[in-house]
């Protein structure tokens, strides 16, 4: 039986083998990671979310962000496999040769993919980061007509710009495209159907890797004695701000 938590993207759950239950464990720190300051805050939020997922019985955890918030801390704290979408996506993209990153966010947020490329030694293999948004989108993220909802439903105002960026990257010699945000997961198949080179959905790559690692691991739970302290830290700021960023740890469990 496959059970999909409504908060987990259906395109991911539907493609996984039967017998897998996906659940979402959102970061309780609601700050949108527009700068390295909020990114550091999300590392703590994701650590706490991962601890909760592991304690609830998850067999693996996926960081639902290419920023891979708190990945080192999560791996140190959890006894279960932890996979970052950024790490998994880059690995898959690099396997095809020279690649480009297409992101729905403005240039001011390129510190996220740039840091990821440095960490994994792939700066030279990446032909470039293509941004399809202007800075003003950061002022209109929330709401029914907000930017995130337009991304999630692959609105033409976003999708057409993404596809144009993909075509520019191909003209520059890209042999694969990595989507620069897991929020683009819902449009990944549509993009792939309209282009001639592989389109890497980092969230899907991470989910596949997590399932494989969980099947080969018997470990469960956590391995840190700091879980309560982490929760007290998050409790102090939880609910203080809600900037409509659905960042979370997606956990895999097995029936």
Ranges and model annotations:
Residues 36-52, 154-164:
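Glycine-rich, highly charged phosphate/nucleotide-binding loops
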Residues 75-96, 192-210:
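Short, acidic/small-residue loops that bind anionic groups at enzyme active sites
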């Amino acid at each position: 039986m496959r059970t999909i938590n409504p908060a987990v993207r259906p395109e991911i759950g539907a493609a996984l083998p039967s017998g897998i239950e996906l659940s979402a464990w959102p970061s309780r720190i609601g700050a949108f990671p527009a700068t390295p300051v909020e990114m550091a805050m999300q590392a703590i939020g994701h650590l706490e979310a991962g601890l909760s997922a592991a304690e609830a019985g998850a067999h693996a955890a996926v960081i639902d962000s290419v920023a891979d918030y708190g990945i080192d801390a999560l791996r140190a704290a959890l006894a279960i496999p932890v996979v970052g979408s950024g790490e998994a996506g880059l690995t898959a993209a690099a396997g095809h040769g020279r690649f480009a990153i297409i992101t729905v966010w403005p240039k001011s947020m390129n510190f996220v993919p740039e840091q990821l490329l440095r960490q994994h030694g792939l700066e030279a293999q990446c032909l470039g980061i293509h941004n399809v948004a202007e800075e003003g989108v950061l002022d209109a993220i929330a709401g029914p007509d907000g930017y995130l909802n337009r991304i999630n439903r692959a609105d033409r105002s976003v999708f057409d710009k993404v596809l144009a960026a993909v075509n520019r990257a191909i003209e520059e010699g890209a042999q694969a495209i990595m989507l620069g945000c897991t929020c683009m997961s819902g449009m990944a198949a549509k993009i792939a159907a309209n282009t001639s080179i592989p389109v890497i959905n980092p969230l899907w790559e991470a989910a596949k890797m997590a399932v494989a690692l969980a099947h080969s691991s018997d470990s469960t739970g956590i391995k840190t004695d700091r879980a309560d302290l982490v929760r007290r830290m998050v409790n102090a700021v939880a609910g203080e701000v809600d900037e409509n960023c659905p960042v979370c740890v997606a956990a895999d469990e097995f029936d």
